[in-house]
Amino acid sequence: MTLRLLEDWCRGMDMNPRKALLIAGISQSCSVAEIEEALQAGLAPLGEYRLLGRMFRRDENRKVALVGLTAETSHALVPKEIPGKGGIWRVIFKPPDPDNTFLSRLNEFLAGEGMTVGELSRALGHENGSLDPEQGMIPEMWAPMLAQALEALQPALQCLKYKKLRVFSGRESPEPGEEEFGRWMFHTTQMIKAWQVPDVEKRRRLLESLRGPALDVIRVLKINNPLITVDECLQALEEVFGVTDNPRELQVKYLTTYQKDEEKLSAYVLRLEPLLQKLVQRGAIERDAVNQARLDQVIAGAVHKTIRRELNLPEDGPAPGFLQLLVLIKDYEAAEEEEALLQAILEGNFT
């Protein structure tokens, strides 16, 4: 019934039902502002939308609302339910016809590759271009061949078109077009869940949305771990830019964060950095003092207390920057590993 209501409502407004949503289960007492607030939170992954109207349904003793979208969207992005005043609201959506969707995406992909459907058919091992519609094949024979084509091309088709993430920089005063962290994180998390692509492609799309300090954080993490996952990237951004502890609690946490047994010094520095950047963001540490603050805590928290001497850092010299410190530590760790390997070889020769 609700899908039919969506179709009839859209027909009465001369609009495409696949560019609209019906929100059902809304409390009678819910105001327009409360509906808008719930839509803003629940429909963030869909991009732009507009509340077009409301209606009371006597059989449910509830309101329904019609929401217009700027374009047809993927079924994977549309939530089945969203939280609203008085409980959970149902989201009714008329998905695109799967055959038409696949064929349009297939044709678009082939056009970009300079291929025809007939050439694709031959590439898949079908003689005489049997996938080509002009061959006059009966519809029943298309199904298995289309399924094979879909399986072969699915990775490329998934990457062909996607909604880009909103932009986030982590700057204290976001520039025009940039989101504040909370809204950006919610939207990004929802979008990433919906993407049916490999993690490496998700990470590429995530990096595409980052600017300024936020991009710098992920670049540094990638230097230490080139295979860092999207979830790890989001966790790091949450630690640096998310609103959590007050400055005093954060400072105590920073000063009591020590290197763990068997933990590499470089890993400790990377674990410490998000806390330090939070303190800088909240004004607890001046930006021009951040390098010295980092070095002081690394020396205080390291398992080996001779680390300053091991890294050849003078007592009265300027503290190295983050990347410079990591390079020094990496070189030190590499030298230690090489020495341990040589020692093991020598011991093996004399036993």
Curated annotation (Swiss-Prot):
Keywords: Apoptosis, Autophagy, Cytoplasm, Membrane, Mitochondrion, Mitochondrion outer membrane, Ubl conjugation. Signal peptide: none annotated. It holds the Pfam family PNMA. Residues 120-127 are annotated as: BH3-like. It is found in: Cytoplasm, Cytosol; Mitochondrion outer membrane; Extracellular vesicle membrane. A motif (LIR) lies at residues 49-52. Transmembrane segments: none annotated. Ubiquitinated and degraded during mitotic exit by APC/C-Cdh1, this modification is inhibited by TRIM39. GO terms for biological process: apoptotic signaling pathway; autophagy; extrinsic apoptotic signaling pathway in absence of ligand; extrinsic apoptotic signaling pathway via death domain receptors; intrinsic apoptotic signaling pathway in response to DNA damage; positive regulation of apoptotic process; positive regulation of autophagosome assembly; positive regulation of release of cytochrome c from mitochondria. Its main location: cytoplasm. GO terms for molecular function: ubiquitin protein ligase binding. Coiled coil: none annotated. Belongs to the PNMA family. The protein is evolutionarily related to retrotransposon Gag proteins: it contains the capsid (CA)subdomain of gag. The BH3-like domain is required for association with BAX and for mediating apoptosis. The three BH domains (BH1, BH2, and BH3) of BAX are all required for mediating protein-protein interaction. Homodimer. Under normal circumstances, held in an inactive conformation by an intramolecular interaction. Interacts with BAX. Binding to RASSF1 isoform A (RASSF1A) relieves this inhibitory interaction and allows further binding to BAX. Also binds to BCL2 and BCLX. Recruited to the TNFRSF1A and TNFRSF10A complexes in response to their respective cognate ligand, after internalization. Interacts with TRIM39. Interacts with RASSF6. Interacts with ATG8 proteins MAP1LC3A, MAP1LC3B and MAP1LC3C. Does not interact with ATG8 proteins GABARAPL1, GABARAPL2 and GABARAP. Retrotransposon-derived protein that forms virion-like capsids. Acts as an effector of BAX during apoptosis: enriched at outer mitochondria membrane and associates with BAX upon induction of apoptosis, facilitating BAX-dependent mitochondrial outer membrane permeabilization and apoptosis. Required for death receptor-dependent apoptosis. When associated with RASSF1, promotes BAX conformational change and translocation to mitochondrial membranes in response to TNF and TNFSF10 stimulation. Also promotes autophagy: promotes phagophore closure via association with ATG8 proteins. This is Modulator of apoptosis 1. It comes from Homo sapiens.
